Amino acid sequence: MVIMNRFSLVILVTAFLNAESFETFYQTGELKERFETKDGVREGLYQKWYLNGQIGKQSFYKNGVLDGELTVWYPNGVVKATYPISKGMIQGTAKYYDSKGNLSWQVYEENRPNKNNNIDFSSWCLN
């Protein structure tokens, strides 16, 4: 059991050895961004704040590529948009909200631009 615990600790330390956390700040000193890298490549949670301290954006990275839910907020703290991202591309339904949090419209996966960069608007859900 002791050998297994030491082995697990070595693996854990090795896994995080090349990981770094970064924070950037506005000139006024308020936190602007927080993110992590592994071996110099963005990995994990990314967050960006407005100057007023309100979260403005949150996303996730895997091997330097967006992967996971991306959320954007208005400066008043209300969700502005959500995007389901997989391997750097929107997969699923992107949702857009007005400044009061009411769903304004959605873009479904099948409404992505085609190879000619055209979009079929017939199946968009407008509220």
List where the protein language model places each region.
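Periodic aromatic/glycine/histidine/acidic cluster detector
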Residues: V2-F7, F16-Y74, V78-S86, I90-N127
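Gram-negative bacterial Sec-dependent N-terminal signal peptides
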Residues: V10-I11
